[in-house]
């Protein structure tokens, strides 16, 4: 089981999260109502928080202590969540980019032209092959 999966498993009830974060239940529910955290629900409809949720609550608490308002917190958290996606996109793009040598480029172009020629003709005969049948 990967570390990311473990950290996102809903384990903690609100009482434990209150002790870990030193936030009140009302504050935690308020952050949920404002879409800052998304705790899972148990079968009895009780909130269950993951390590990620606790980390996010601690980050929210730190931002509030610095004087950041709710709109600012939402922007900061949205930006922080978008950055890993951008980094992942950059990682997938980088392996595709590499400099081709002149010989590799010629071979690639030659193969593409040959493929294009096959599809444009629609048959496997060369022009010279057809002329034998008509002379």
Curated annotation (Swiss-Prot):
GO BP terms: negative regulation of DNA-templated transcription
InterPro entries to which the protein is assigned, alphabetical? DNA-bd_dom_put_sf (IPR009061), MerR-type_HTH_dom (IPR000551), MerR_fam (IPR047057)
What residues does the HTH merR-type domain cover?
11-79
Characterize the regulation of its activity: Under conditions of nitrogen excess, the DNA binding activity of GlnR is activated by a transient interaction with feedback-inhibited GlnA. Under conditions of nitrogen-limited, GlnR is autoinhibited by its C-terminal region.
Q: A single GO molecular function, which one? A: identical protein binding
UniProt keywords (A-Z) are:
DNA-binding, Repressor, Transcription, Transcription regulation
As recorded in UniProt, coiled-coil segments are: none
**Region annotation Disordered: where it falls in the sequence:** 80-101
DNA-binding annotation, residue ranges on this chain: 14-33
- KW DNA-binding (keyword) present: yes
Output this protein's name. HTH-type transcriptional regulator GlnR
